[in-house]
Amino acid sequence: TLPKRLVVLGGGPIGSELTQAFARLGAKVTQVEMLPRIMIREDPDVSAIVMNKFREEGIDVLVNHKAKQFLVEGGRKVLVAEHDGRDVRIEFDAVLVAVGRVANTKGYGLEELGIPLAGTRTVETNEYLQTIYPNIYACGDVAGPYQFTHTAAHQAWYAAVNALFGMFRKFRA
């Protein structure tokens, strides 16, 4: 069932895509982002265009709002967010959390093999998606730089082709 009032935590591409989708389906959506703008990895102009479009479509976009806690008060669900040093209370019926992902690199023996991780906790690879060991490849969320399904599928093709046929195709992010 479509929630009447939806809070979306996160202003990245996935949070923004789902914000607009639910709003267009008829939910009253409030998007909460702790950074100064949504779509922070994009050019500021792109961010502004998306935010303005969302507001034209009736979406409440709250930037510089840091989610602190969820409460139930008198049967009502409330998100408490901090903005400019003050608490802001946002009532909602459902919440969608889209605040990013971290690659899961623990428990696979990468540390024991000495396979280095980048600062983003992704496996370091070369342009052929090989690690420091030419027979170990990484792709998808664990290889970065983007954590999208379509990127993972694209990288998987490159890694498989390179593993089977040698250094055949370079992946360019």
Language-model features and meaning:
Residues P3-V7, P13-D87, P145-A153, V161, ...:
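Rossmann-like dinucleotide-binding cores of NAD(P)H-dependent redox enzymes
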